[in-house]
Amino acid sequence: MSEVITGETAMDQVVIGTAAAEMAPTSEVVLETHGVNVYYGSNHALHDTSLAFHKGEITALIGPSGCGKSTFLRSLNLMNREIKGCRVEGEIIYDGRNINTCEENLYDLRRSIGMVFQQPNPFHKTIYENIVFAPKRHGLRGKENLDALVEESLRGAALWDEVKDKLNQSAFSLSGGQQQRLCIARTLAMHPDVILFDEPCSALDPISTLAIEELMQSVVKERAIVIVTHNMEQASRVSNRTAFFYMGDMVECGQTDQIFQRPKDKRLNDYLTGMFS
């Protein structure tokens, strides 16, 4: 049984961001899970997790290393299917169906539920081709259409002004922060309903981190965003909701200001106050 705490005993030094105030929550649920369990062989890594993700909101997943948050994130667009011996049980509801049991075209699914990884992973192609590669595969044709999509996506990722004169250069000519924004632009080009971010700033400097955070807040209006982060200050700055994971359990979830200022579970309070990490 979890121990409930009272009073404002969470870490007072975290300044709660303005995401919740600036982005009004909507009632439209874009993606939700019911009783999701994940196994790696005989290891039961994630236990009976149910969460809903709303259009126009950023949800942060926090918790110590190995607690199940990235495992849960990867289940949302069936990335765990790429891991030998991994089994996912429960319902993952997107577009009115349980994608965990449907025979999904994974390529099409990941157009709609995109993912940005911890390390930038641009294709070994030009900046331009990084953006148009997937749309061309899905049938987009015509230089005018492709050019417009490239500009739209790079502007969406706040990268256009920095690269508009070198679109035919290698993506690897960019800095690490620019490469990560290019990966976000590549995701935006598919017009996803959900974007999953798996510690997208862990390899970036503070300036690049701020740029990514501002970018997430600028593109969330038309979609749901889910971010895994070890940076509690980042979670407090960018998210509307926060879910705390511990030892495979989703322990507590709520509005970000409530999670950080008035945690109900002692394990969450201990994590926020540095009793463990």
Where are these regions (language model features)?
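Conserved ABC ATPase signature
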Residues: 169-174, 178
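Conserved catalytic motifs of ABC-family nucleotide-binding domains
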Residues: 191
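Conserved ABC ATPase "signature" region
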Residues: 91-98, 143-165
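ABC ATPase "signature
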Residues: 253-254
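Catalytic Walker B motif of ABC-type/P-loop ATPase nucleotide-binding domains
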Residues: 195-198
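ABC ATPase NBD Q-loop/coupling interface
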Residues: 91-108, 168, 259
